[in-house]
Amino acid sequence: AWSADGGETWTGWRIVDILPDGPQDRSYGCFAGLVRLPIAGRDILLYSNCDSPAGRKRGTVWVSFDGGKTWPLKRLVWKDPFQYSSLSAGRPGTASEGWIYMHFEGRLPQTRVARFNLSWLMDGEPTGDGAVPKIGSR
């Protein structure tokens, strides 16, 4: 989707059924995280949210290798209570380069930060929504 007015209106949007927005039995979302990885020549997006029909738990990251058209891979990051996540990618040329950070609420009042990389995500579970490309030495 694209917005030319700061998010007031959107064009080209669509619902992506493979990506949950919070508990699947509710009509409200759970503030998912989304980030584009700063990798030259690639359009890799990551999405984080809970992946459980039984409520706010199973914090999972989904991976898209084609700018969000498909989401062929996911990996569980946190199995316990999980909500309100945000994602950020390390900056090139700094000590954080190559790292992905996920900040989220666990069991209240706890907040947590998970740190992982794309290689770790590549060992995730196929979703059936598109193909997983070979990255690096894979």
Name each model-derived stretch:
Residues 1-138:
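Asp-box/BNR beta-propeller blade signature and adjacent active/binding-site loops
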